[in-house]
Each structure stands twice: as C-alpha cells, then as structure tokens.
C-alpha cells in the first residue's frame, strides 16, 4: 500500500507512485475525509476527487445509509452533480438496517440511474479498531490479516464483484516515466522502524534508493 498525497508529492509524484505500484489486475485507491475535502473549503486540491482525476480512476461512492432512506438520493445526487465530471460511476450502500431499508433506498435512488454495486448490512464485525489519530497501525494488530480475510469473505455476497471488475477494466492506460539510478549506493541512511516509528511514505525510500542511497532499518 502507498500514500497518494498531491500536497506533498505533486500531481506528477502521485502519478509516478500509482503507476510504479500498480503491478496487479486492479488497483484500489481508498479515499479519506469527504470526497471533495482537501486543502480548503473552496478548493478540491489534495482531495480524493483530485487524486481520482490525476489517476483518471472511476469512483465507487460508499454512502452511510444508516438513519436515512429517501434522503440518500439527495446525498448521492449532490455528490454526482457537484462537479460536471464527478467520476462517480457507482454506489455502495453501507450500514443498512434490513431488507426493507435496502428496498427503500433503492427506490429512492432508482430515478438517478446510478448503478448500485453493493448493499451492506450493519455488522460490527466489519470494522477495524481506531483511535483519535485514525486506524490502529498494522504493527499493533497481530491478527490484522485474519481480520481482513474475514471481512472480505463476509462482504462478497453483498457486492457485485463482476460489475466492479468490469468497470476497472474499462479504464484507459496511463503511464509515467521513472528515472532509475544505475550507480551503486553511495550513502547509507538509517531509518527507525518499529512499533513506535512506523508511519512513513514509502515512496520516500524508493526515491532515496533510486538516487544511490542504501536504507538500513533499526529499532531505537
């Protein structure tokens, strides 16, 4: 996993990171905050929408359907119409209370003709622990892989996986040139890496290595 941050990396850096780490059938980019939330209240800069534009990615908008039914259509329409090209190609409804609740949301959304690619019921097991600064780091969760596997298996029946894959395959090719140094490592850089020091942008390490550095990790 990598961080795509236009604020620190610039659009060019985001594209380079995305392309160089996309050696897979499908690349999934998870947004943070609200879809259009970025640098300021009157700019999309550094928002998830901004990143989607840089990478030319189709967007699946996940909506919290708890405590709403017909109003969810107004929310979805607002996101889609906020910009001429919102890049939103489908919806996933989350935290549904019942089949009746799902049917009400579907009925409200039907006139918008936005594909609904998933309807996920409320389930406390479909969450990862968090605290005031965000999710608990992976290094502090010994059973994280097992949790993710369990969540994935639970979600499969509620998602239109084939349609999601089809949307991903319709995206056009993108490319970015990355210069790789052929010189041997000239400098060794020590980096603290353990349970206390673990939040890094790994593209920084890649950049250092491309420019002749050898990274040595240690625990203080």
Question: Predicted segments — roles?
Answer:
Residues 185-220:
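Phosphate-binding active sites in nucleotide-utilizing proteins
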Residues 1-55, 63-87, 99-103:
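ATP-dependent carboxylate-amine ligase catalytic core
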Residues 28-30, 60-62, 64-65, 92, 94-97, 190, 192-195:
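Structural motif
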Residues 59-62, 117-119, 216-217:
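Short hydrophobic alpha-helical runs that function as membrane-insertion/retention elements
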Residues 1, 103-110, 204-208:
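Short, aromatic/basic amphipathic alpha-helical patches
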Residues 55, 112-113, 211:
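Short, structured coil segments at secondary-structure junctions
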Residues 69-181:
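Internal gly/pro-rich beta-alpha loop/helix module
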